[in-house]
Amino acid sequence: MTNKMKRFTFCAIFALTVLLAGASNGVYNVRDYGAVGDGKTLDHTAINKAIEAAVADGGGRVVLPAGTYLCGSIRLKSNIELHLTPGATILAAPAKLKAYDESEVFGAPEYQDGGHTYFHNSLIWAEKQSNISITGHGRIDGEGLTKRDTERAGNLQGGSIGTGDKAIALKLCRNVTIRDITIYRGGHFAIIATGCEIGTIDNVTIDTNRDGIDIDCCKYFTVSNTKVNTPNDDAIVLKSSYALKKPVLCEHILITNCIVTGYKLGTFLDGSYVPEKVNWVCGRIKLGTESNGGYRNITIANCTCMWSSGLAFEVVDQGRMENIVVDNISMSHVHHYPIYITTGCRNRGPKERTEVSSARDIYINNVIADDCDSLAGIIVTGMEGHPIRNVSLSNIRIQYRGGGRSVTKPYREQGTNYPEPRWAGPTPAYGLFARHVDGLRLHNVDFELMRPDERPDIVLEDVRTID
C-alpha cells in the first residue's frame, strides 16, 4: 500500500470513527449532516437528516452550534431533543423559497381559526410524537413566518403560498419540554400545543406579534418562569377548540412565575421596553375564546402583567369552565380591564350540540393592580337563566384612572357577541360590574381612583352575594 493510500485510509477511518462516536453518545451535530449556518443556505433538510439519523438509533440530542440556520419545516420526532446552543438561530425562510411543508387535509375547518387547524406548514412541528424537547439558549427568529390568518379564505398556508404560520406547532404529542429558548416574531402562534399530554414550558422568552403560547385541548401542562411580550394578541392563552373534531377539555394546567407584557414588538428583547400606544394592546393571560370543551382545574399564580390587558376567562362555545384558581397577581398600566369573566352563546361548533356554556367555582385571591383603564372594572357576567356560580374575589386592590361618565345605556348581554369588553363600551361601575351570578363572595376588595369618576364603584344585576 502506498503512503497516499495509507493517508486516505487513515482519514476515512478517522471520519467514520468521529461519526460513530457522535452517534454512540447520542449527540448529532447538524453540521455533520450538511447544515451550513450562514443564514443564506437552506438548512432544514440537513437538520431533518440529523433528526432521522438520531431516530434510527433510538433517539438523541440534535445540536445546532452557533450560526444562523435558514429553515423551512423541521419535523420533530419521538425521543429527540432539538438543542440550540448559545449563538444559534433558526431563521424562518421567506415565502418565496417555498420551504414549508404542505398543510394537512382537515375536514371541518369552519369551527376554529385556521391557526388551530393546520400544523404541518410550521417552522418546527410534530404530530403524534412522544418524549420530544426543544432546549438551549439559542433563538428562533420567525422573520419569514406570516402573522395572518387567511386559511378560511381558502389559503391553507396561512399567508402567501409556501409561508409558514407558526414557530412551534405540536399536535397529539406526549411528554413535551420546551426550555430556555428565545422566540422572536413567532408568526400566528409562537408556540401552540393541541391535544398534548404532560408538557413543560420553562424559562422561555417570547417577543412576538400575535399569540405567544397557546395550550389547546391539553392536559397536565406547566408554563413557568416564562416571559411573553405580545402587544397585538394574547400572551399565554388556554383554549378548547374543535381542532380534534370533538369537544376536549383543557385541564390540569399550571401557569406560574410568568411575566406578560404589551410593549412594542422587539423592545422587550432589546431592553428598551417601549409601551405600545395603539388602541388595542393585549399581552394578557386568557382562557378562550375557543371553548368547545372548556377548562377545568386551572391554576394561575405568582404572575405579573405590565402594559397589557389583565386576566380574561371566557367560555362561549358550549363548554364548561370550573375549578379556576388565581393567586398572587401583580398588574401595572392595565389596558381595558383588570379581570374579565364571562359566559356566552357564540356556539362556534356543530349545530347539533345542545350544551349551554357554564362557569363555576372561580377563586381569585391576592391581586394588586395600578393605573387601570377607566373603560371597565372587574366584569363578571353570566347569561340569564344560566348564571355563573360561586365566584370569590378576595384581597384585591385596584387603582383606576377614573374620569368616567355616568352610564345610562344598559350594558349589553353577552349573548352571541364576541367576548371583548372594549366593544361593549364602558361598564356601569368603575370598580366591579356583575350580572347573572349565583354566589358572589367579596372579601377585602378595595378600589382607588386617580381622579373622580361619575360611576358608582359596584353595580350588581341579578346577583346573589355570599357574606
Where are these regions (language model features)?
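Extracellular/periplasmic carbohydrate-active domains that bind, remodel
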Residues: 23-467
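Extended hydrophobic/Leu-rich segments
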Residues: 5, 20-23
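Bacterial N-terminal signal peptides
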Residues: 11-19
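Bacterial N-terminal signal peptides that target proteins for export
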Residues: 2-12
